[in-house]
Amino acid sequence: NNNYGIEIDIRERNDEIIISHDIPINDNFISLDKLLLIYNDIGKKLPLLFNVKCDGIKDKTLSLLRKYSIENYFLFDMSIPETVQYAKDNLVKFLSRVSDIEESPILLDKAKGLWVDSFYGDYPSFSFLEKYVEQNYFLCFVSPELHGRQKKTFWIKLREWLKSKDLKRNTVLICTDKADEAYLHFNHDLED
């Protein structure tokens, strides 16, 4: 009953696209087909971010997205050879990556935005992203608690940077396990 998007890990099993971070060892998973049916039944068109966990599922995934008329989505984290295939298809909305170990996003000219991550600590500033903001790229930040680190300082710095850039809310997302806290933190005093 919230207005949050969903980050979903997808992979293939027995010729079907399923929701699973790891390769499943049993049949305890939900299919992407069923999840999209539920998503459509809810009636909200909230963002869906698909973390692609295996190669070769682009066409099946796009077919399911078309079946349910899903347009507010992004695919990301494909292998580099797979990203090349996604970039060749102008119908695909994919995110390139930038992180503390991936300084130059690949195929950015074909991407709709950036998945912004940091594996070894928080960024000292977000100034390196300004060129992407100026080019109107969508940004999705990975919150530090997903890597086992504290989120408070990162969230404070990110909020200050976002306010200084006057970014539209629909151009920036944060991937977090603390969605309610994030909503309050990033929207407090911003609604005035």
Segment roles from a protein language model:
Residues 1-55, 63, 71, 75:
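An active-site metal/cofactor-coordinating segment within enzyme catalytic domains
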Residues 38-42, 64-68, 86, 90, ...:
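Alpha-helical structural signal in soluble globular domains
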Residues 52-104:
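Hydrophobic, well-structured mid-protein blocks that either form specific transmembrane helices
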